[in-house]
Amino acid sequence: MMKVLVDYPSEEEEFVIAQRVTGAATAVAAVASMGQLGELQQECRKVYVDPSLMQYAVKLVSATRRPERYELAEIAKYLTYGASPRATIGLIEGARALAFMRGRAYALPEDMTGLVGDVLRHRLVLSYEALADGLTPDQIIQRVMKRIAVPDKPLAPGQSA
């Protein structure tokens, strides 16, 4: 669903990792049952995602496939393949999960905008021209995000303007 960039650990952190992996097995206590995890998934699916936020996800992903439709013709030469509809689903589900973890029953734009790079970066296939110009998927994503307007904060269900 995502490709999260993680820096290398410090030497101290790497030492701890090496100790844990190569040392004796330690007992691990379950913190949740499979049933409880299933219940959490069902609760997460109840988080409201406003149609304007869903449309934002669709536009972000679509702009990687048809950049000229979004006045992004300058990036078309850098993309061999854009993201598929699975990226749209990943953005929506990711925003829903973040909202749930943040204790809300509805997703806000910031729940989605922080995930765009993680969801899209491994789904874009850059052209040889992009590689020759030293461009990264994240740079292309930033151009798309600057062009596609973030929706106004959607109201929670049942609220009126």
Each language-model region and where it sits:
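C-terminal engagement/docking regions of AAA+ P-loop ATPases
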Residues: 69-161
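Conserved C-terminal "switch" segment of AAA+ ATPases
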Residues: 3-75, 101-105, 109, 130, ...
